[in-house]
Amino acid sequence: MAQRRRSFSIGEAVEELVGPDGQKWADMDPEERMLVAAKAFPHICAGHGEGDVRREAQSTLYDPYSKASVTSGKQPAFPAQLHHPHTESNGASEAVSETSQRLRKPVMKRKVLRRKPDGEVLVTDESMISESESGTENDMDVWDLRQRLMNLHFQEDRESPVDVSQKFSLPREYQGISQDQLICYLRREEMGPPAYEQDLIVASRPKSFILPRLDQLSRNRGKVDRVARYFEYKRDWDSMRLPGEDHRKELRWGIREQMLCRAEAQSKPQHIYVPNNYLVPTEKKRSALRWGVRCDLANGVMPKKLTSFPLFPS
């Protein structure tokens, strides 16, 4: 009973939308078609027992961390209407595909503070790109055009060009653009949904990954030993040479080669040692005389009389 009631509600909505013979839908202009399809779309979704398929598909498609995540194994899928484009090819499916939901993109605010090696503080705003409602509506129109073009390419082999031109109708702002120009524009847009800033990141490198900088390695210069600092300065000095400066290492090796090419050095004559008998004048003789007099007095030896020099002159 529930199944019969659901099918009846879907048929009633389609009949009200298209008309008994399809003449009502053909007589409408694009604006009226959009208005009628927007009113009938919730009834058709309720008849299927599903919610807003477009919103669910976009919630899966616009996951900002799905492409940047390393552990995520799920790939973003197209909306459910693109997986089975041949299931609904009547006027109701075309009317549903023309409806564009005015969704506002979610905004995630994220500010990151980083410190440079010189101590400067750098604050970067890594929030997702948020656009106005007009920009969102324009992106949704482009995405809707992509859907219809993909359905058109799938069905153009089965249908004639006249039927395709009758079923595929562009919005008012795209009426003056040819189909080839529109295909080139969509290919230039890479046939994908509106991209966020997070979608531009390589999947193998998350946004939270920061590449190490070489100048940060010399931040703890006080902990480096003197030998490493000497070689660092020497490498910097060798890399920045003055114009016209001689390479001292090459000059030294050249002089060393010249020294090795010479003959053996002549031997110097040996020094002949000559003994020196010079006696430095000191008090050694006087002290020796005193020591002799003391020894004679201790032994009771009388000193010799000097006959030539009388002790007591007359």
Swiss-Prot record:
One of its GO terms (cellular component) is cilium. It is found in: Cytoplasm; Cell projection, Cilium; Cytoplasm, Cytoskeleton, Microtubule organizing center, Centrosome, Centriole. Residues 64-106 are annotated as: Disordered. Residues 88-100 have a biased composition (Polar residues). Its main location: cytoplasm. Pfam families: HYLS1_C. Keywords: Cell projection, Cilium biogenesis/degradation, Cytoplasm, Cytoskeleton. GO terms for biological process: cilium assembly. Belongs to the HYLS1 family. Plays a role in ciliogenesis. This is Centriolar and ciliogenesis-associated protein HYLS1. It comes from Bos taurus.
